[in-house]
Amino acid sequence: MNIQEQGFPLDLGASFTEDAPRPPVPGEEGELVSTDPRPASYSFCSGKGVGIKGETSTATPRRSDLDLGYEPEGSASPTPPYLKWAESLHSLLDDQDGISLFRTFLKQEGCADLLDFWFACTGFRKLEPCDSNEEKRLKLARAIYRKYILDNNGIVSRQTKPATKSFIKGCIMKQLIDPAMFDQAQTEIQATMEENTYPSFLKSDIYLEYTRTGSESPKVCSDQSSGSGTGKGISGYLPTLNEDEEWKCDQDMDEDDGRDAAPPGRLPQKLLLETAAPRVSSSRRYSEGREFRYGSWREPVNPYYVNAGYALAPATSANDSEQQSLSSDADTLSLTDSSVDGIPPYRIRKQHRREMQESVQVNGRVPLPHIPRTYRVPKEVRVEPQKFAEELIHRLEAVQRTREAEEKLEERLKRVRMEEEGEDGDPSSGPPGPCHKLPPAPAWHHFPPRCVDMGCAGLRDAHEENPESILDEHVQRVLRTPGRQSPGPGHRSPDSGHVAKMPVALGGAASGHGKHVPKSGAKLDAAGLHHHRHVHHHVHHSTARPKEQVEAEATRRAQSSFAWGLEPHSHGARSRGYSESVGAAPNASDGLAHSGKVGVACKRNAKKAESGKSASTEVPGASEDAEKNQKIMQWIIEGEKEISRHRRTGHGSSGTRKPQPHENSRPLSLEHPWAGPQLRTSVQPSHLFIQDPTMPPHPAPNPLTQLEEARRRLEEEEKRASRAPSKQRYVQEVMRRGRACVRPACAPVLHVVPAVSDMELSETETRSQRKVGGGSAQPCDSIVVAYYFCGEPIPYRTLVRGRAVTLGQFKELLTKKGSYRYYFKKVSDEFDCGVVFEEVREDEAVLPVFEEKIIGKVEKVD
């Protein structure tokens, strides 16, 4: 091996003179200039051999045997040697430049001994075995063994097998020197390089940089020597000159002398930060087969130097040039001495275009200087933390209050909806609405007149509150008086004008809340107004009249004012004197006070009303107590009779009785189910304390407790309905009868859903069954069987004798025989729908019955 050391090229910038030779003419870079002591170009040649071939160039090799002295454009050019290095390890080790580059890589990796040992073994094997070389061969074998194998910490010793090391040691100890004694060790080291170091070298930056620059890598120039590259050096360029400095010939002499330790193309220390952005670029590596090519184009280390004959253009110019090349497919890389006009012949067109696109992407990211814009206030204006916190807390509290109000309103509306939904099934619940704040017009005459004033004042105070309090009072009043009649057909809250007129014309205000009042309602209002005036007339002028005379006259006038046209009743309105003498108990005025505010207003107005009274208060006697007890007992007995009558005939829930021509409202039996034929001559109110003001009212229940109880009962009813079909029919019957009741516009809203007893329901079912049996002439011991055959929309219906039908009997009904699957409908609470189709497979199994029928589906088995 003839390897000569190569020094670092001289920097022409340090000793530049006017007599220095000019740069070579484009196309003549490969010519050897004998007068210049320094080489005109620096590159590794691809020649194989030991001698120096300085007159050739790997970029454009000069061939003297051609007519023009070089290859014309369009002619074929040999594959560059650095691409052959990727074929195999032997191709790499057969080239001197490849060996030098590979050794540089191994030095960086700390395993250069592998390559040295491989060449040492090759040289030892080439020594001729003769007597004169015997001693030399022994010394060389011992030197190789001591340097590479004896040291167990060395890379070669670690990669060599123990048996191989023992064999080599035995040969040296016995002095049996054989040319092939290191062949096994060389083979093992070569295998190690092929598996590890050689693939790593092909993927290393040093090899990729070498291929990118066209075999002109600065790293190779500065780190190693090559026999084929001696005598060559990089062309001298002026040193890097800053923008604000002036170049001098003798500047930085010491720095230039010390640049042997660094590549000539490396940036000075002071320019590292200035050129950081252009030097940072990402390199992607591609491999196609055995060929390894470089990734996206990267700017050279020093942007002020010309690299491989290509001058760098500004960023905008480079972008425009690349875009023009991609758009027009023009050739913008033209050189005077190139085989294919600047495009390497070993690249296919597709790869070249892809590389150009990658270059455009990289050049498009050139950092631009900051351009100051017009100053404007930023969007996020800084605010003082304390002021910002106060503003934020204020807004959040407003949002929280809004949400809480919405939640409360929704909760109350939900309660009202629950009451409305439970109105059909719960006889104790009354219809919701603002009209529940006052009892019906005729019922007011059973209160003392001061209670009338108190009720109006309480209503006025209640309507002056916010809507939430109105809604609360409405819910509480509905729960406390579930059976009370609504004041009128209107469901709109009275405005201030209506409220102001209430004490004057109570009957009209009580029944005339809506804009459009029917004629019957007008009659009722007029009657109520007339009767109201009659009461006040007795207040001021007839306090000294006897009680019996007052009662008789009040009864007579109440008959004329009663809008339902019933017979005269015995519990009509009474004079103020009698009302106060009978109903002066402390709890009498509290009967109307359903809420706290109304109660306070009642007490306040009661004191005002008592100031100008001249009537004497009397304590009720024994006859009045007996009369009261008799009324209570009679009311209870009549209620029981009415319930038994409902069970026998169902008259109270049928709603089929036609009213008389002069009746403008629903029958009394529908409004008050407990009112029997004997009691239809008297108006029986819903509560006992209205019948007799001396009776204390019931304690007001807790609304939340009532709601919880209603919800619990509804849940229990749903559970029982899902478990027992009879219970479900019970609830459905109740809801149906509640909806079937006719509600004319002029009549009060129904308070109580007519009761449906189990006995009545069973009687209804029995009658329906008898009716069906009589219509179809179905025998009692037969059952209807209906089935859908193979997805047909219309079922088949037939009669089967017996109540228990098995699957075998059902199969005999089918006209088509085959393999089928049978499903039958049955009641089940397993799913929400309440029914399922159950498959039956055994012929002896009894088919389920659904609503007195057997309903089945026959599906064909595929």
From Swiss-Prot:
Region feature (Interaction with HIPK2): 677-752
Entries under SUPFAM superfamilies matching the protein: Regulator of G-protein signaling, RGS (SSF48097), Ubiquitin-like (SSF54236)
Ranges of biased composition (kind: Pro residues): 429-441
GO terms of biological process kind: apoptotic process; axial mesoderm formation; beta-catenin destruction complex assembly; canonical Wnt signaling pathway; cell development; cytoplasmic microtubule organization; dorsal/ventral axis specification; epigenetic programming in the zygotic pronuclei
UniProt cross-references to PROSITE patterns, sorted A to Z: DIX (PS50841), RGS (PS50132)
Positions of the UniProt region annotated as Interaction with PPP2CA: 575-789
Keyword GTP-binding set for record: no
Residue segments, region Interaction with SIAH1 and SIAH2: 353-411
Effect of P385A: Loss of interaction with SIAH1. Decreased SIAH1-induced proteasome-mediated ubiquitin-dependent degradation of AXIN1. No effect on interaction with GSK3B
Subunit and interaction comment: Homodimer. Interacts with ZBED3; the interaction is direct, enhanced by protein kinase GSK3B and casein kinase CSNK1E activities and decreases GSK3B-induced beta-catenin serine and threonine phosphorylations. Component of the beta-catenin destruction complex, containing at least, CTNNB1, an axin and GSK3B, that regulates CTNNB1 protein levels through phosphorylation and ubiquitination. Interacts with CTNNB1 (via the armadillo repeats 2-7). Interacts with GSK3B; the interaction hyperphosphorylates CTNNB1 leading to its ubiquitination and destruction. Component of the AXIN1-HIPK2-TP53 complex.
Name of the protein described by the UniProt record: Axin-1
Species this chain originates from: Homo sapiens
Lineage, opening ranks: Eukaryota, Metazoa, Chordata, Craniata, Vertebrata
